[in-house]
Regions:
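N-terminal Rossmann-like NAD(P) cofactor-binding module of classical short-chain dehydrogenase/reductase
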Residues: 31-40, 65
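Beta-loop-alpha module in the N-terminal Rossmann-like domain of NAD(P)-dependent dehydrogenases
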Residues: 44-52
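Conserved acidic residues
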Residues: 19-21
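Glycine-rich, histidine-containing beta strand-loop boundary motifs that form or position
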Residues: 41, 68, 109
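Structural signal for hydrophobic/aromatic residues that build the beta-strand cores
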Residues: 1-2, 37, 52, 64, ...
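Oxidoreductase cofactor-interface core, primarily capturing Rossmann-like NAD(P)-dependent enzymes
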Residues: 2-15, 24-25, 46-47, 59, ...
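ADP-ribose/adenylate-binding Rossmann-like module
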Residues: 55-71
Length: 118
């Protein structure tokens, strides 16, 4: 698990936790030797994935899975209903731009999440 240096969350025993700055140079160092990244950045940090993507490219990471665990955020009608998905579209477009670097990516559209709806 890659998390910010300031994060005080206690993780389960056996989980490798790397606490670091989310600045590009710090991320490049900790991402070296990794094959893939699965981003679980929350809504307030979607745009910060660009720094993570750039660091992954510099570190030679082969695959990036963005924080895209929802419906098809490339759909205009979905983004009209859920405006918070607009930054997710921007990240997918950014990944498309970066394909020429050799970084591959997968966006996971799992459908709407209703567990939190009461």
């Amino acid at each position: 698990v890659l998390t910010r240096s300031s994060n005080t969350t206690t993780f389960p025993a056996g989980v490798t936790v790397i606490r670091t700055s989310y600045e590009k140079f710090a991320l490049e160092k900790v991402l070296e030797g990794q094959d893939a990244i699965i981003s679980a950045i929350g809504a307030s940090g979607f745009q910060e994935q660009k720094v993570l993507i750039d660091a992954a490219i510099k570190a030679g990471v082969k695959r990036f899975i963005p924080s895209e665990f929802s419906t098809n955020t490339l759909s205009e009608s979905v983004r009209q209903l859920v405006p918070v998905f607009e930054p997710k579209k921007a990240i997918l477009e950014y990944l498309m731009e970066k394909e020429s670097t050799g970084l591959t990516w997968t966006g996971l559209s799992i459908g709407a999440m209703f567990d939190w709806v009461s």
